[in-house]
């Protein structure tokens, strides 16, 4: 049986493993590495704080994630792949209530971003 997401080290493992997958993905990697030219040493700690805030209520993340995504050349297919990779990463590493919550939160974030980008209608 896998363990649930319980510690900051678990958040780091989740984020690092997920973005390793993103960097190997033929659809998502160009968005992050070619278009956005993400500085991973800067970006990953932000993502650790973001998911710590989302899952643990740590309030470590201070920011507005949506505006940074506005200029990205993404469509529904990108969001579907992002969710698929995130969900697979969670399934590979964790199970339990907090892992389930992470899947639900990620799906909700993706849905809101797609609505705000005009990729889907409100439902």
Q: PLM features: residue spans?
A:
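Core of compact, soluble alpha-helical bundle domains
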Residues: 1-123
